[in-house]
Amino acid sequence: MISVKGLTKSYGSTDAVRDLSFSVDRGEVVGFLGPNGAGKSTTMKILCGYLPADAGEVSIAGFDIFSQSLKARSRIGYLPENVPLYPEMRVGEYLAYRAALKGVRSRRVAEKVEDALQLCNLGHVQRQIIGTLSKGYRQRVGLADALVNEPDILILDEPTIGLDPGQIREVRSLIKGLATRHTILLSSHILSEVEMTCSRVLILNKGQIVATGTPAELRESSGLSLSGAVRLEVQVPDADATLKALPELPHVASASLVGRTGEWSTYEIIPSAGDPRPALFEEAVRRGWKLRELSARESSLEEVFTSFVTGGAAQVSLSEESRS
C-alpha cells in the first residue's frame, strides 16, 4: 500500500531524509519511531503530498504521490501532530464540510459523517462546539476527519500526544479497531504505546532507517532480548553441583545460588549473547528436575530503540521472508 524508494529531502545544507526506502503492506499497523529531528514528520508530510521531495519515489495504493497527487491523496487519511480544527464549528458540521472538501458525493456526506462519528465514538457530541471539547475529544475529531472519506491508508503523526493516560487508552483501542479496515502508519514518542498497537516498527535516525521488524525481532537483533538476570527455581538433589553445571549450558555467562527453601533452590543466571531459557528448560527435563520458576524480564522497546539510535546495535533490515 505504501512504497518509498530512495527518498531524499534537504532544508538548505541539512538533510532531513537521506535515501530512505521502506514499504508498508495492506493491513499492517506500522510504528514509525525516531528521536526529534530524525525525519519522521518530514517523511509523513511527503507521503501525504504536503511537501515535495528532492529525489526518490513514493507510491500510495499504486499511485505516484508526485505525478498522480490527487488520486494518491484521496487514498490517505492524515492526522497531523497538531490537528487544525475550526473551534467555532460544531463537530458534525465540521466533518460534513471536510467530507465535501475530500470529494465525498453530496448524497453520501451524511452517511459518511455518521460512520466516522460512530467509529470514533463521537455521536453524543456531534452538535457540540469543537472549541469546548477536551484535548482527547478534539483528537478524536481529527481522527474522524481522517476517516470520513473511507481512505485505504491512515497516516497518524503522534496520535496520543498531550493526552492523559485514560485518553491514551481510548485512542489506542480506537486505532486497534481501525486496523481491521485500514493500513496504518503512525509515529509516536510513547514507545510502550507503539509496542501495544503496532505489528511492525521502523526506527529512523538522522534521516535513515536503522532497523525494521517486529518488537521481538528488534530485541533479538539488538542483542537486548533479555534485560537483566534469569531466575531459575528448581528442586534438585545437589544444589552445589547444579550451580557448577549451569554455566556449561548455551547462553549462560554465569550463575549464582541466591536462595534455598526446603528442597527448592533458586539460581540467578546472567545471560551471554542469546536467551538461555530454552537450554535451561531442556536441562531440567533431561535431569528430571521439578521446575517452579523460569523467568526473565524482556528488554523494553525503549531500551531497544536507544540501542539503535545511539549506535549500540548494528543497522538491521529484516528480509521479507523473516516478516512473513
Listing of model-derived features with the role each one plays in the protein:
Residues 272-324:
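C-terminal coupling/interaction segments
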Residues 77, 103, 142, 220-224, ...:
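A generic structural signal for secondary-structure junctions
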Residues 114, 132, 261-262, 299:
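Positions that flank functional sites
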Residues 172-272:
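ABC transporter nucleotide-binding domain
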